[in-house]
Amino acid sequence: MYYCVPRLATGLAIVLCCLLASSLPVKAATGPDADHWTFGGSAYLWAAGVEGTSAEGDDIDIPFTELLGSLEGGLMGTLAAQKDKWTVIADLLYLSIHEEDDTTGNLVGLPVELDVDVKLRGFVSTFGVAYRVIDVGGTSLDLLTGGRYFDLDVDFEAEFAAQKIEYSDSGHALDGIIGGQVLKSLGDRWYVSFYGDIGTGDSEVTWQVWPVAGYRLENLDVVAGYRHLKWETDDGDTFDDLSFSGPLLGVKFSF
């Protein structure tokens, strides 16, 4: 009779873990360093909200401010190695999230007031290899292939009517992706770019689009844009579809 409650908690945990997982493409090296390996990275604040549908048919609508309030700690970073037309990218994320809330659950079709405590520890990695196929007149096109992987542990606890529910679970998923990024320079400093990818594997389909405007400084780029990421699944255990959308602000740097 309690099956729907832990399943919904696991779905929420996956939502939180996937929110910040991302591939952050970094432009390939040019000029005199094109024959040598160079290294760079990216850091972003993505103010994304979450919308979707759970496996039970419930609507999911979580604003960015609510997700931020649940964060206990985390480590997030992206590194890229570039040589000539090739770029190797690895994005790593560790999150610890703790959410306590009074909510209404659905047990055997009846609404029940619940005191809910959810703890999540998650690891996400997005990785890939990109190759520059066009680089002419301030316009470039990179094609990418790679994957997304996540691993998470969830501890769920709920109390209602002097009874207590405890539930723990773990899981992982791996999807292959293909994608590309086009970049157009607007003079020496300004540029615009558009990144997109699509993939499948343990999920039915995952895809994203990511338009960005950037400004080049001496040792880093300042970028601003908008990102939309969506997953669809056919396993019926957690959610039917999820989308993550919101503005972003960040920097790209090299060393």
Predicted features along the sequence, with ranges:
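Short glycine/proline- and aromatic-enriched beta-strand/turn motifs that initiate or cap beta-hairpins
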Residues: 27-94
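Residues on the lipid-exposed face of transmembrane beta-strands in outer-membrane beta-barrel proteins
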Residues: 41-43, 77-83, 127-131, 145-147, ...
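Outer-membrane beta-barrel pore domains and translocons
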Residues: 44-46, 82, 93-95, 132, ...
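Outer-envelope beta-barrel architecture signal
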Residues: 33-39, 75, 84-86, 137-143, ...
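Outer-membrane beta-barrel proteins
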Residues: 24, 28-32, 83-85, 128-136, ...
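Extracellular/periplasm-exposed beta-strand and loop segments of Gram-negative cell-envelope proteins
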Residues: 49-72, 92-124, 150-173, 201, ...
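Cleavable N-terminal export/targeting peptides
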Residues: 1-36
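Transmembrane beta-strand segments that form the barrel wall of outer-membrane beta-barrel proteins
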Residues: 190-206, 228
